[in-house]
A protein has these predicted regions:
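Two-component histidine phosphotransfer core
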Residues: 1-154, 162
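Short C-terminal beta-strand
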Residues: 161-170
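Gram-positive cell-envelope targeting signals
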Residues: 92, 173-176
Length: 177
């Protein structure tokens, strides 16, 4: 747990280092450390399955992109069910784009929240600033990559939520050129 705390703090503080992107591999390592911390806080509450298509771990993505989605799945999806649940992180190529999915078996999101999110507004119903991490990820993708890339949320109340990020396929070695 100490290693996970130190690694998470170190990586989070590096956000201001001028690099806005990191590899999928590093992003998954940060997310794993975050999950270690949450498993300590909430033992036996959630399971996580990660599936990353072969050859995609060197793709570049915005820093601290997966962790806020996983955090949201735990805190706003799984925990309110008062039962254990599962979270999937799935990374694959679809139609020439990088697709990152975070899916949970949580309580789901209301249609009103989904509508507000699609309109670019806050998902929080009472301006409590819940879901700020999800909104931050959405806004950073729009800023960094423009039209054709972004975030979609699919949800059924009582069944769970799937967040789908669509990103360009950029390799780490391409950035170094």
């Amino acid at each position: 747990i100490v290693h996970s705390l130190i690694y998470t703090l170190h990586e989070t503080l590096k956000v201001g280092d001028g690099n806005v992107e990191t590899t999928i591999e590093k992003e998954l390592e940060l997310t794993k450390c975050y999950l270690d911390i949450q498993r300590y806080r909430y033992p036996d509450v959630f399971q996580v399955e990660v599936k990353c298509e072969e050859g995609l771990k060197d793709c570049l993505v915005p820093k601290t992109m997966i962790q806020p989605l996983v955090e949201n799945a735990i805190l706003h999806g799984i925990l309110p069910t008062e039962a254990s649940g599962k979270i999937w992180i799935i990374i694959q190529k679809q139609g020439g784009k990088l697709c990152v999915m975070v899916k949970d078996e949580g309580i789901g999101v209301s249609k009103e929240q989904l509508k507000r999110f699609k309109q670019g507004e806050t998902m929080a119903e009472n301006k409590t600033r819940k879901h700020i991490g999800v909104e931050n990820v959405r806004d950073r993708i729009r800023y960094l990559y423009g039209e054709g890339f972004g975030m979609e949320i699919q949800s059924t109340q009582g069944k769970g939520t799937t967040v789908i990020l669509t990103l360009p396929v950029k390799r780490a070695e391409e950035k170094e050129r």
